[in-house]
UniProtKB/Swiss-Prot annotation:
<dbReference type="InterPro" id="IPR013785">
    <property type="entry name" value="Aldolase_TIM"/>
</dbReference>
<dbReference type="InterPro" id="IPR012135">
    <property type="entry name" value="Dihydroorotate_DH_1_2"/>
</dbReference>
<keyword id="KW-0560">Oxidoreductase</keyword>
<comment type="similarity">
    <text>Belongs to the dihydroorotate dehydrogenase family. Type 2 subfamily.</text>
</comment>
<comment type="function">
    <text>Catalyzes the conversion of dihydroorotate to orotate with quinone as electron acceptor.</text>
</comment>
<feature type="binding site">
    <location>
        <position position="172"/>
    </location>
    <ligand>
        <name>FMN</name>
    </ligand>
</feature>
<dbReference type="GO" id="GO:0006207">
    <property type="term" value="P:'de novo' pyrimidine nucleobase biosynthetic process"/>
</dbReference>
<keyword id="KW-0288">FMN</keyword>
<feature type="binding site">
    <location>
        <position position="245"/>
    </location>
    <ligand>
        <name>FMN</name>
    </ligand>
</feature>
<dbReference type="GO" id="GO:0005886">
    <property type="term" value="C:plasma membrane"/>
</dbReference>
<dbReference type="GO" id="GO:0044205">
    <property type="term" value="P:'de novo' UMP biosynthetic process"/>
</dbReference>
<feature type="binding site">
    <location>
        <begin position="62"/>
        <end position="66"/>
    </location>
    <ligand>
        <name>FMN</name>
    </ligand>
</feature>
<keyword id="KW-0665">Pyrimidine biosynthesis</keyword>
<feature type="active site" description="Nucleophile">
    <location>
        <position position="175"/>
    </location>
</feature>
<keyword id="KW-0285">Flavoprotein</keyword>
<dbReference type="GO" id="GO:0106430">
    <property type="term" value="F:dihydroorotate dehydrogenase (quinone) activity"/>
</dbReference>
<feature type="binding site">
    <location>
        <begin position="318"/>
        <end position="319"/>
    </location>
    <ligand>
        <name>FMN</name>
    </ligand>
</feature>
Length: 336
């Protein structure tokens, strides 16, 4: 497979520049016959989750295609689902560059992107043009300049705009790169948010005559008590699923490595064990009442199987995809 050569060239570039270059090429081919260049035939392995049928259990995690620009090209690679976003009500530039760093030896990434995106209206226009036949998740967040106490308004605005076009909606309250965002995972703040989201979901179901499930994406840095509390809230408010996990602030496994001191969320192989442990504990607390989408450091068939063994119904990749390329998709879907 050609990817090792492509990777070598891309890794000569600054990480964000490499991402932009790759997406430039994918944008050129998306929706054209040239999509055949990235198309991979993978086996169909249907999985039912949140009332939806996924053609296989592997998805692309949020954060790679923030604006839904390359849905068809990414879909052609064999993913059963794509989660686009995180998108916010209004466009925003994100944090200052540089804001994305490779930890090559650890096969990890640190990012402090800060929800850079072109806004929810732009994303919806891109979704309307796409022909992806898998499940499309849309991950939503709040604008940086929206006070945390008004944060739920941003989620409701986004829900309203994406509802008609989403297979499921992911609520991102766990990015470490938007000040105060993670506080929405705790106690009354979480309950208030989930009540508002559930009410909005019911209203939108009545308007659109279809039920779009909602999943909440959580952090890997929750202590035992917080994890129990989150699980309890998700069950009490009849949320449809949970995505575990986002990136970590923990640097214990990458001490001494180049870029390890950069602020932001760490993903990739160093997150693998931590996210699997959260999935395992969450699975015990949820007791089969709520499906888990497992994400965090999946870079092989074994890593994907470990997530499923810990309690995940579906799995997603991001950093592993950057380091291993499209062959990882085929490998996981074939052997999972």
């Amino acid at each position: 497979m050609y990817y090792p050569f492509v990777r070598k060239a891309l890794f000569q570039l600054d990480p964000e520049r490499a991402h932009e270059f790759t997406f430039q090429q994918l944008r050129r081919i998306t929706g054209t016959p040239l999509e055949a260049l990235v198309r991979q035939k993978v086996p169909t392995k249907p999985v039912t989750c949140m009332g939806l049928t996924f053609k296989n259990p592997l998805g692309l995690a949020a954060g790679l295609d923030k604006d839904g620009e390359c849905i068809d090209a990414l879909g052609a690679m064999g993913f059963g689902s794509l989660e686009i976003g995180t998108v916010t009500p209004r466009p925003q530039p994100g944090n200052d560059k540089p804001r994305l760093f490779r930890l090559v030896d650890a096969e990890g990434l640190i990012n402090r992107m800060g929800f850079n995106n072109l806004g929810v209206d732009n994303l919806v226009e891109n979704v309307k043009k796409a022909h992806f036949d898998g499940i499309l998740g849309i991950n939503i967040g709040k604008n940086k300049d929206t006070p945390v106490e008004n944060g739920k308004d941003d989620y409701l605005i986004c829900m309203e705009k994406v509802y008609a076009y989403a297979g499921y909606i992911a609520i991102n309250i766990s990015s470490p790169n938007t000040p105060g965002l993670r506080t929405l995972q705790y106690g009354d703040a979480l309950d208030d948010l989930l009540i508002a989201i559930k009410n909005k979901q019911n209203d939108l179901q009545a308007i659109h005559h279809k039920y779009v499930p909602v999943a909440v994406k959580i952090a890997p840095d929750l202590c035992e008590e917080e994890l129990i509390q989150v699980a309890d809230s998700l069950l009490r408010h009849n949320i449809d699923g949970v995505i575990a996990t986002n990136t970590t602030l923990d640097r214990s496994l990458v001490q001494g490595m180049k870029n390890c001191q950069q602020t932001g969320g760490l993903s990739g192989r160093p997150l693998q064990l931590k996210s699997t442990e959260i999935i395992r504990r969450l699975s015990q607390e949820l007791n089969g009442q709520l499906p888990i989408i497992g994400v965090g450091g999946i870079d092989s068939v074994i890593a994907a199987r470990e997530k499923i063994a810990a309690g995940a119904t579906l799995v997603q990749i991001y950093s592993g995809f950057i380091f291993k390329g499209p062959p990882l998709i085929k490998e996981i879907v074939t052997h999972i």
